[in-house]
Design a protein with these regions (language model features):
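Accessory N-terminal regulatory regions that flank AAA+/P-loop NTPase motors
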Residues: 43, 49-52, 62-89, 407-422
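Low-complexity, intrinsically disordered or signal/transmembrane-proximal segments
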Residues: 3-6, 25, 32, 37, ...
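Conserved AAA+ ATPase small/helical "lid" subdomain
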Residues: 302-370
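Amphipathic alpha-helical interaction segments
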Residues: 136, 163, 190, 283, ...
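C-terminal engagement/docking regions of AAA+ P-loop ATPases
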Residues: 364-422
């Protein structure tokens, strides 16, 4: 036994040169002791843990390996939030991190403070949303898919609460315990209902901590689950019948509120009750109507995505013009268009950004160049057509009747690439 311990001490005191070496040492240790007996040697366990921290820290905690696919707004705009909070002299509503003017500047931008604009929307609409939340009313954002409702709710929650992590994703499988609270069943069986056994869900956490809770796609949630919000929105209290005493009721702290989103295309799937509708102020988020604004947004957003993907080239302006013009020509924006002109697919600005990103990636990875009209034809088909044969015919008709009439070089190159359509 002593000999084995000496061998182990000798092994763990030699620092491995790489994380792979760490696993080799663990394998050597396991040859001398069973796992349970090995971990009883506390000095060995501490040494292994120390080696793990030292040699895995640089590899797995470095910026190169800690890139998030989509950083939350609180991380992405941390410097702007800190600057706004430092310069914020206006009074804040109870429980808010920023005042209303500062929250407005965070969303719409402020050139004087070098704060970027994060969404294209009417300033008056943002002001109405902030006032609604400041008065304690729930806020519901409705609109066509891809109109930045989720982004807007994230920005609002970040400006008010400092983060937007308390999010409920609505769907047919969403249950009440995913919204309010659940239980650690091991503790529940051993010790019975208690606050230690309770597992808080986003709504419980938001009420407890005084933060904004986001409820995405609320109309896709079953009606009986939607109605569990009634008490929280009216009386601001959540009852936990399994507990007794003060723990059986959770009263919302200042700052708590709910921002819900709903797509107009989901209307009728799970229609909200009249009682729940009364507890929300509804704000409609419209598509971007101005061509120049939409083009600018697609250009900036796609450039950011391409940089995140390690692509050194932006999509050329001419290709972006083709993309945005195609989307605007084929989408139903309330303009006078027949069913022969518009597609059933969601031709949103968000989809246009995704297509622009795909064009840049395709051109650089496959051809080592910037995007061209032919790349756009390849990438646009999967977004527009999907599995609808009528949309496929409409897209081909659009190329023959609309694209062919443009005489500019990039439009003609776009037309000549029509044979790439599926």
């Amino acid at each position: 036994m002593l000999h084995n311990q000496q061998v182990i001490v000798k092994v763990v005191n030699k620092e491995p040169a790489s994380p792979a070496g760490f696993f080799i040492y663990c394998d050597l240790l396991s040859r001398y002791f069973p796992l349970k007996q090995l971990m009883r040697q506390t000095f060995i366990a501490r040494r292994i843990f120390f080696i793990f921290l030292i040699h895995f820290r640089d590899e797995y905690m470095s910026p190169q390996n800690n890139h998030l696919q989509r950083p939350p707004a609180a991380v992405l705009y941390a410097d702007e939030l800190a600057k706004l909070k430092q310069n914020d002299n206006a009074p804040c509503p109870p429980g808010w991190q920023l005042s209303l003017p500062a929250a407005r500047a965070f969303i719409l931008g402020d050139s004087a403070q070098n704060i970027s604009r994060k969404v294209v929307i009417s300033p008056s609409a943002v002001e109405r949303m902030l006032v609604t939340l400041a008065t304690g009313r729930g806020l519901m954002l409705v609109g066509e898919p891809g109109t930045a409702k989720s982004l807007l709710s994230e920005l609002l929650a970040t400006a008010i609460s400092g983060d937007a992590g308390l999010t409920i994703q609505g769907g047919a499988s969403t249950t009440e315990d995913q919204i309010k609270y659940g239980w650690n069943y091991a503790l529940l069986i051993n010790h019975g209902p208690s606050t230690e056994a309770l597992v808080p869900a986003p709504l419980y956490q938001g009420m407890r901590d005084g933060k904004i809770v986001r409820f995405e796609e609320i109309t896709r949630t079953p009606l009986e689950v939607q109605d569990c919000l009634l008490g929280m929105l009216s009386d601001r209290v959540m009852t936990v019948p399994e507990l007794t005493g003060e723990a059986s009721q959770l009263y919302a702290r200042e700052g708590f509120n709910i921002i819900a989103t709903a797509n107009t295309r989901d209307r009728g799937v799970n229609e909200m009750s009249a009682a729940l509708k009364r507890r929300f102020d509804v704000e409609t988020v419209f598509p971007i109507m101005d061509f120049a604004q939409e083009l600018e947004l697609v250009a900036s957003a796609s450039a950011r995505l391409l940089a995140h993907s390690g692509i050194p080239h932006k999509v050329p302006d001419a290709v972006l013009e083709l993309l945005v013009r195609t989307f605007r020509d084929l989408r139903a924006n309330g303009e006078k268009k027949t069913s022969m002109d518009t597609l059933t697919a969601i031709m949103s600005t968000a989809e246009a950004v995704n297509v622009a990103h795909a064009v840049g990636v395709r051109a650089w990875i496959l051809a080592n160049r910037a995007g061209e009209p032919a790349d756009l034809v390849d990438c646009i088909a999967g977004t527009i057509v999907k599995d609808n044969e009528e949309d496929r015919a409409r897209l081909r008709r659009y190329f023959e009747q609309r694209v062919a009439t443009h005489k500019e070089a990039h439009w003609q190159a776009y037309y000549q690439a029509r044979h790439r359509l599926p």
